[in-house]
Amino acid sequence: MNLKNILFGNGDKNTEGGTERLVPVKEIYGGVIALKNGKFVTVSEVLPLNFYLKSELEQKNIISGFAAFLKTAPDELQIIVETRPADISAFCERLESYYNSEKNTNCRQMIFEDAQLVNFIAETEGLSRRFYIVLPYTGQAYEISEVAAEIGETALTARQYLEACGLETVRHSNEDEFLINLLRNYFRPFSASSEAPDTALPEALTPDSADCTGSGYICIEGEYRSYLYISGGGYPTTVGLAWGAPFVEAGDGINISFVLKKESRDKILPKIGNTAMFNRSRLKDVGDTRQDFEQLDDAVESGLYMKSQINREGEDFYYLSTVITVTADSPENLKKREKDILNLCGANGFSCRKAYYMQDKAFLSALPLLQTDTDIFNKSKRNILTSSAAALFPFSSFEMCDERGIFYGLNLHNSSPVIIDHYDTSRYSNGNMAVFGMSGAGKTFFLLLLAMRLRMQGVRVYIIAPEKGFEYRNACEAIGGRFVSIGAGSSDCINLMEIRRNTLDIDSEMQGDRDNSSVLLDKIQSIHIFFDLLYPAITPDEKYLLDRAILNCYKAFGITRDNRSLTDKSGKLKKMPCFADLIPFMEKFTELKAVTMALKRLVEGSASGLGGQTNIDLKAPFIVLDTSRLSKEFTALGTFIATEFVRDRISVSRVNKKAVILDEAWKIAGENGNEQAADFVINLIKTVRGYGAIFVSATQNVVDYFALNDGKFGDALLGNSRLKLLLQLEETEAVKLQEKLMLTESETTEVIRAGRGEGLLCAGRNRIAVEIRSSDTEFDLITTDRESLAKRVKTE
């Protein structure tokens, strides 16, 4: 007699031809799985949502919607969470289309290398999560064809309720193939294929080999698996919304099975009442100093609470069972992953136990077949009400992997690729981004990397660089961009007075001109902001006279408030005045002498690059406007001219995607910044979305960022930037952002200790640690590292 076998069951080593007992599937037909025990189930794949991207109200609505689903769902259901290597095939297909249409050699090379890089991450590090709901057939039919017709109604109802709470269910072109491939991952992990099997079920699912003799793991076709469960008393007393999220993000090789079993109210209420009464009677006999007094008191209160919620609030009573599958390629790696999941459970208040001598039973319980073993279920079941069951909501993922986005790098939480689609308005209320990072953290590197990848996807990019603009030149010119240097000694010039459009109607190219607002008056507002920067002491009287001088200057060129005066008979825009043309009109007013002298420095003096006619082609798809060569007193002026030009360019149409990148935004909004110029930038940030554009700002001086007007500029910019990237920061600056973004202590510490090129990516309440990744060609074009540059010079 073997005592171990009597106590724990007999684990048999299955050899070829003896592994069929592991497969409880009899047949698959019409999207239905027929089991050998006579039961039927159907499986629906559910696409997750970024729960923490939602507002608090949206989160509550999602949980309420999921509770409504549970109310209408069958009494028993299973939720499966699988971790798999990331599937980035759709993203790579898009890169291929960009590669085929790209003419610039360097861009083609970078697109090719990016595709290789993303594919490498997906194969070696990248993970994705798949979510499934398993529903049983509860009707009376016995034939699978009849079952398929009836269970389809159940699946349709479930789909409608899930969609009502924001979840989308996947509709596969061939449901039977989907189910076969899903099950192959469990039974034949290294034989999974998208093709239909050559043999009939269940032979097609039967593993070639399986070893179930181990007390702590089984081995299916060389894949080692161990099974753990959350013990019935191992759950926290109170849980928050989406409390199942930590399990979802557990990491590589971790799958989760949640089984919910609803109990009849008529059956469960008497049990709850009797148990509460029994515990109350025991409480009378227990002194309040005994160790178990509080446990009994809590049990009484819990029983009364559950009874009240069921009777008065209409909640249902469920048993929840959670089984965790850990997979690895060796017993050593399996043990390491087991330790990780045990630590994760402990850190989140859960008590996790290993299913020793029950691994084969746990294996069957974890299959997406709703076949939980009775022993496993009794050891792991926990009673919960509808509200707590709905709050489980495991269909939440920290992944940021948009199919049509820009590749950022690696998600350090779960090793998935980070791909962000700034233009997806269904996911992000706006695609604007604020980037923070101390000197040397990789801020400029990231900005250029983002800009080049946007350019490679057909986005028109404008970069404004008030500091160290030369760092952008090499990459800009290598991809066919236009580098514009605005400053002393430069021949490049942009005329602020130039009017570049004949209507303010952004939709005029599609629906005709319906907006008669004066383009001239709109331009004059910008000119006045420029003079506020140029001559901060200007008085209201001087502003009035300046206004007259500007109007008279435009009138001399045949331009009035009437938009029709902007073009000649051929329909082309007329020649526009510049500051050199404005000076004679200003000199007619002696009261403007001081203002005129300030302007003359831009026309005749050392800063003449700011006052002449536009002499460069500004229609390139990638433009860098470098104002860093200007002296400190003119930096804000040059940056404003560049920003005003960009606003002009992006507001012509909203058909094409555009991106505006402003580095060192504190130059405009810092302590010595100009409030009107800051308001101009804020207005641009607020309106770019309507132009089909995004605005990306960056700074290494967080304190200065919030210095102007008690932080008005910084707050407005953060409030209108759905995405934030926090690279490494000094402690004082990280603490400042902690207040503004409500970061936790651990998140703040993470930002302070981040390595170069690492940071915290925030999208709403969803925050992930990310490592920026570039290809070799991108790195060579972007890097400002002295040693890397020296190596390149030596090589050349």
Where are each of the predicted segments found?
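Walker A (P-loop) phosphate-binding loop of P-loop NTPases
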Residues: 440
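Post-Walker A helix-loop "phosphate-sensing" segment adjacent to the P-loop in P-loop NTPases
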Residues: 160, 452-462, 481
